[in-house]
Amino acid sequence: MIVRILTARVPERHAADFERVLRTQLPLMREHPGLVYVKLARQAHRDYDDVILFEEWRDARSLYGWAGVDIAKPRLLPGAEGLAERVSVTHYEALDIDPDALAATGIPDAPRPLDHAAN
């Protein structure tokens, strides 16, 4: 499994609009094959919000299917990125599930070990 974390610093004047756009995006993400989990959260400050979009993907194929060829680039609905001061994306290999053991169970679409060359 692959964890993808989008973080954004959003000025207070744009925070409500940015968060509304991301909430609109959540149902689209949940329909995408291979998405296991998604959570949108924020930490509110006086002048800005720090926003995270935590995604868990079954495998690299599913992640690339959603994010496209350049997985370091955020995939946001039009207009969202312009509301933020900065947006970044990072990826992690989930360690709480042994992909080889899960694949051995015969579960369809069980995650395979991540090909580190693809990162």
What do the PLM-derived regions correspond to, one by one?
Residues 23, 37-39:
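Short structured motifs
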Residues 21-24, 69:
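Residues within well-ordered alpha-helical secondary structure of globular protein domains
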Residues 9-21:
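Short, surface-exposed ligand-recognition loops at beta-strand->loop->(often short) alpha-helix junctions
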Residues 2-8, 39-70:
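Short, well-ordered beta-strand segments in beta-rich or mixed alpha/beta enzyme
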Residues 28-36, 56-93:
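An amphipathic, aromatic/His-enriched active-site/gating alpha helix that lines ligand/cofactor pockets
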Residues 39-49, 75-119:
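Glycine-rich beta-strand-turn "strand-cap" elements at beta-sheet edges
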